[in-house]
Amino acid sequence: MAKKDVVVMQGYIIEALPNANFKVKLDNGHEILAHISGRMRKNFIKILPGDRVTVEVSVYDLNKGRIVKREKVNKD
C-alpha cells in the first residue's frame, strides 16, 4: 500500500553516517538525511557512497527521507 504524502525522488549517496543513515544529494541539488527502509535492512542490502538510490521524501519534512531502492550498477 503506497503512502499518499510522500514524494519519490532520485539521488546518490554522498556520505555514510552512523546507524544506517546517509547523506543523499538529490538530482534537483538538495541534500537530505535518509535512512534505510526496513525491507532493505532485512535483506542486508549494502549501500556505499556513490550509489544511485530512490528516496521517499515526506511532504511535511523535506530534509529527511527513506531509501527504498538502490539502483543496479552497470559494470562496463
Curated annotation (Swiss-Prot):
PROSITE patterns referenced in this protein's UniProt entry, alphabetically: S1_IF1_TYPE
Protein keywords: Cytoplasm, Initiation factor, Protein biosynthesis, RNA-binding, rRNA-binding
Pfam families per record: eIF-1a
The keyword Cytoplasm appears for this protein: yes
Cellular component per GO, a single term: cytosol
Compartments reported by the entry: Cytoplasm
Domain of life: Bacteria
Gene3D superfamilies per record: Nucleic acid-binding proteins (2.40.50.140)
GO MF entry, a single one: rRNA binding
Residue pairs linked by disulfide bridges in the UniProt entry: none
Domain (S1-like): residue spans on this chain: 1-72
Matching InterPro entries: NA-bd_OB-fold (IPR012340), RNA-binding_domain_S1_IF1 (IPR006196), S1_domain (IPR003029), TIF_IF1 (IPR004368)
Primary location recorded for the protein, binned into one broad class: cytoplasm
Listed NCBIfam families: infA (TIGR00008)
Xref: HAMAP family: IF_1
Function in brief: One of the essential components for the initiation of protein synthesis. Stabilizes the binding of IF-2 and IF-3 on the 30S subunit to which N-formylmethionyl-tRNA(fMet) subsequently binds. Helps modulate mRNA selection, yielding the 30S pre-initiation complex (PIC). Upon addition of the 50S ribosomal subunit IF-1, IF-2 and IF-3 are released leaving the mature 70S translation initiation complex.
Subunit text: Component of the 30S ribosomal translation pre-initiation complex which assembles on the 30S ribosome in the order IF-2 and IF-3, IF-1 and N-formylmethionyl-tRNA(fMet); mRNA recruitment can occur at any time during PIC assembly.
Similarity section: Belongs to the IF-1 family.
Protein name as catalogued: Translation initiation factor IF-1
Organism listed in the record: Petrotoga mobilis (strain DSM 10674 / SJ95)
Gene it is expressed from: infA
